[in-house]
Every structure is written in structure tokens, then in C-alpha cells.
């Protein structure tokens, strides 16, 4: 082990970059669908040893001293995001004749840009670097800070945050209800990096003790919470989730729209599964209705005829506002609408956090001059909604809807979840087929249920549609590409272990604690040297 660490530390040039790239790619095995988190106990010690050797020129400027550490982090991040996000290119192959040219920009360009975050993480860590356990604390702080920044800078994209690798199963998910993702990211990197101390004499026992303590607390809290009796349900809701498995090549084909709509109606109207009552709520996926209701008011009549007394449908739609379909001043929203048993739209919630280049074109007027408008997928460019609110369901239950990747933002969900008893996530991951993408998306939605102590109802066009309880356990689900519907009675009893505000404070305190430890040990080492 010491010989291996020594050889890693002495690497430089392309060899150092290659090992950093491979270490980052290896860390992706800790994410869904692989969930092989043991790989992170190899990749992060490798990163620590690479940073040990990334000292720069001692007589140079601060920039020159830190540049090698930044480069190591960038290469680690490039490997991590390239191996973890390659599936994004699948969306461009759905209409390959039009979008295939952009494949390299998506598959390579996005990881290239995101890698700068991890370069910044290792740069920050190197500023606080010291020997032994101090550098582990510094690295944990650097990644924790960077993962937090990744959640909101440049519109935010906290996909595959390192902390998810420490939560592959419900037993290991419960801690996030207290630490939040901010704290979980810090603690995960710290734990994954501790094996780097196996080659050190000093702090080895302390590192081993901290590893046992933190790992035991992580597992123990999960065991206690899962074993604890659930709070008695105040009420329940009979839910049907529909997964139509519509082929994207037909999604907006006018000649098959009626057939798609008939499929949705048929799955919604079928008899309840044995042991289940009539659904009070039916849930359809994102943009599941293949036309505008302004163009097809008869569709609302058909929905009113299909829904029984007291039933409600929540459906993902493209919603038009401001004119007719031919109007140049019309605005379109990626929305969910609530429809009652009379075929009336009683509520609508528009997607607030749109996907850049996927649902709208940033700096559109400028980029249109360069012909980049065609990067925007789908039939229209969407406008962002102004606010999100809970939808009232039968029985006085309130559900908070999140459309597609909105659910990956912990703070976005936590801010609003206090006003609801259910989290609803509608999505269309069919763009990415049976690649790691839909599994990663589902895992992040699953964690939102645990964080907020609320059941999650998820409808996806081609999967994964599921009901998840407040402790992250999958009650029922439909696999990718399966067509069907699931009926579940959802007890309404969950509540967060701590409030969203307290969870955020806890995470920030954990991050600051590791920054303080790293800084103090760095100062102590400098004083000893001088």
C-alpha cells in the first residue's frame, strides 16, 4: 500500500491526469444503477495521493502553486461526469437526422464544463492541505462546498452529487433526513477518503476510529428509523399511476395522437387491482397529453366522462397562454393540470426550473444568430412558471408537484414541501432509454421523499413510475418500458425528522466544521515548519 501511494504521489504530466481521470470514472460506480459504493473507497484515496503530489512550484505565485491541484480535480471531474452523464447523448439520437451533430457537444462538453467545479473543489482543499487527517477534512470541505455551489450556479445542476453514493438502499438513506445533502456530501467524501490514511503512521488510529464511528452512526440511525413504528395514518389516498410507454418517435405525430390519448384513457379506466379501491387520484406523466387542450376541448369532455364521481386526474400537459396555437404571442408552459370529474381544469402548476437548451434557449436572441435554436428539443420553446403551489386533492390532501428534473434540487423541494402532504413528480425519461440516466433520476427523487418525510408519487412516460414511502422504501413500481398502471393506497402520516431550515443549518455546520478542522491543522503544520 505504501509503495502504491508513493508511486501515485510521484506521478506527473499525462500520467497524473490519466490516473485522476480513471479515478473519477471509477467513482461513478457508486451511483445508480450500479450502487457499488465500495469503488469510492478506491477512487477518493487515489485522489488524495494525487493531490499530495500536486504541490506546484514552491517559489512560484499562489496561482502556479495551486494550478496542479486544480488540474487533478478537473481531470477527476471530467472522468466522473463523462462516465456518469454519457447517456445525455441518447436524447439527441431520438431525432438523429436533426440533432446528431450536437452529440459531441452534449456528451463531452457538459462533463468538460462541470469538471471545473471539481477543479475548484481540489483547489480549495489544497489551500487547506496538511498532512494526514487534516487533508481528508480539507478535501471533504472542498467537495461539500462545490456540490452546494453546483446546485444553483449557472441555473444549477446537482446531478449525481457524491453524497448519493453513500445512500444506495433505504437503510443508508435515513441520515440525509438530518444532515441534508449538504452535510451528506461532506461526510461521504470524508468517509470515502479515509483509507488514504492506511499508509500514514500518524492519525491512523484516529482515522479508523472516526470511520467506525461515522459508519456505525450512518447504519445505526437507518436501522433505528426503519424499525421504528410509523406514525398512525391520519387519512389515506387511493392512487393510480399510469405509465403509457409511448414511443418518442410517435409522441407528437398528429396521426397517432388519438391512439395515444386512448391508451391513457384505457389504463386510467381499467378495474382496480385486487384488494384496492377505486382510485381517488389518477396521475399521468410529464407532457403525456399529446395535444393542446385549447385545440381539443373535446378531450376534456372525454376525461370528464372517464372520471368517476369524486375522482381527480393530475396530468402533465403543454399549456398555452396568450392566444391561439397560431398566434405569435402565445406562450407555452410545461405544466401539470388538475382535472375534476366534470372535465374541468381546476388548477395548473407550471414548471419553474427549465432545462437550459432542452426546454428553452439561454440568451436566445444572441444564439439564434448563430443557428443554435435547433438545439431546443420538443415541439415548442417553453416559458418558465412564476411560482409553485400545492394542488388540493380529494380528502383535503395537498400535493406539491415537481416536473422532470426539478425534483433533483433539494432546496427547491424542501422550501415548498412544508405546505403539502405528498410530493408528486411527473417526468418523461424516455429520451434516455434504458441507460443509467432514468435510474439516477429516480434515486434522486427517492431521496427527496426521505429528506422531507413525505410520500412520493412518480409518473414517468417509460419508467420508472413508482410510489415511495417517507423512508425511501419502494411500495410499488413499474419497470422501464413497461406499459401499465399501479394502484396503491398511500397513508398520509409522514413528517420530516427535522425541518428543512434545521436540515440546512445542520449541513452548513457540518461543512464549516470540516473547514475549521482543515484550516487549524494547516496552520499548525505551517507553524511547525516555520
UniProtKB/Swiss-Prot annotation:
Topology within the bilayer: Multi-pass membrane protein
Single GO MF annotation: N-acyltransferase activity
Listed transmembrane segments: 8-28, 36-56, 69-89, 105-125, 127-147, 180-200, 204-224, 505-525
Keyword Transit peptide: no
Pfam family, one: LNT_N
Biological process per Gene Ontology, one example term: lipoprotein biosynthetic process
Cellular-component GO terms for this entry: plasma membrane
Compartments, record wording: Cell inner membrane
Enzyme class of the recorded protein, top EC level: transferase
Main location, first listed in the record: membrane
Residue ranges constituting the CN hydrolase domain according to the UniProt record: 242-492
PROSITE patterns xrefs: CN_HYDROLASE (PS50263)
Protein EC: 2.3.1.269
Pathway(s) of this molecule: Protein modification; lipoprotein biosynthesis (N-acyl transfer)
Keywords: Acyltransferase, Cell inner membrane, Cell membrane, Membrane, Transferase, Transmembrane, Transmembrane helix
Signal peptide region: none
Protein's UniProt keywords contain Oxidoreductase: no
HAMAP family with a match to the protein in the record: Lnt (MF_01148)
Similarity-based family: Belongs to the CN hydrolase family. Apolipoprotein N-acyltransferase subfamily.
NCBIfam families: lnt
Protein name per UniProt: Apolipoprotein N-acyltransferase
